Amino acid sequence: MSDEDWRSLTPVPSPKGEGSKVTIPSVAQQLLTCAFHEIQEDATVDNALKAMPLLQEAMRRYPRNKNCLRYMAVVYRIMGEKDKAIDIYQQLLKHNCDSYLYAELAELTDDPGKKAALFCQAIQNQRQEKFRSGYRLELSRLLIDRDKSRAAYELLKCIASRKTQGFGITKEIQQMIQQLSGVQPVTDADQQEFYKKMVEKYPIC
């Protein structure tokens, strides 16, 4: 691709308000985004390898770009280079606190305590409850055999969010409900304190 293909278009007036500007991503950036979505939908080594040349050029041009680094981490994960992917996520989380970064790093983490701490941070750094439900379900899974009261708290929050969004209860969630039957969940204050302690016990870097 030429330099022109990598050049973002001149900002144009935004429909959101007078005086504001939006920048149209370059052709190459748009292709990279499409390739990443395809990889997420079909996470195969072949698809990762196809995207690699474009991604490597993007990294050469924008070595600190958050999206490019994230895409590279996902490709490394698919290709089995887990340590390289983890290094990138840790680098990203030194300067960014996006909830999905914590969750994606959690998926690469084997230690149950560290994994739980990362999902705690994903929950804390996501303002919209509807996007927390998946993180809460993952945390409940991790806690169900270790701390049933906290697992019950997260599961109830997850179920409430799913109902608000019009989602049904899956077979897995039904099984978890049965497993936690009769368990009294902790309070909001107790769980917030738990998040804090987990983050202190398992620092990211």
Could you tell me what each predicted segment is?
Residues 93-97, 119-127, 144-167:
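TPR/TPR-like (Sel1-like) alpha-helical repeat modules
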Residues 89, 97-104, 110, 114-120, ...:
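Intrinsically disordered, low-complexity segments enriched in Gly and acidic/Ser/Thr residues
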Residues 54, 61, 88, 95, ...:
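Residue position in alpha-helical solenoids
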Residues 41-45, 79, 109-113, 145-146:
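Structural motif corresponding to the intra-repeat A-B loop/turn of tetratricopeptide repeats
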Residues 51, 85, 115, 151-152:
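Single-residue signature of alpha-solenoid repeat helices
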Residues 1-15, 20-42, 50, 61-74, ...:
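Amphipathic alpha-helical repeat scaffolds of TPR domains
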Residues 169-205:
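Charged, low-complexity interaction regions that mediate assembly/partner binding
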Residues 48, 55, 89, 119, ...:
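Inward-facing hydrophobic residues that define packing positions of alpha-helical scaffold repeats
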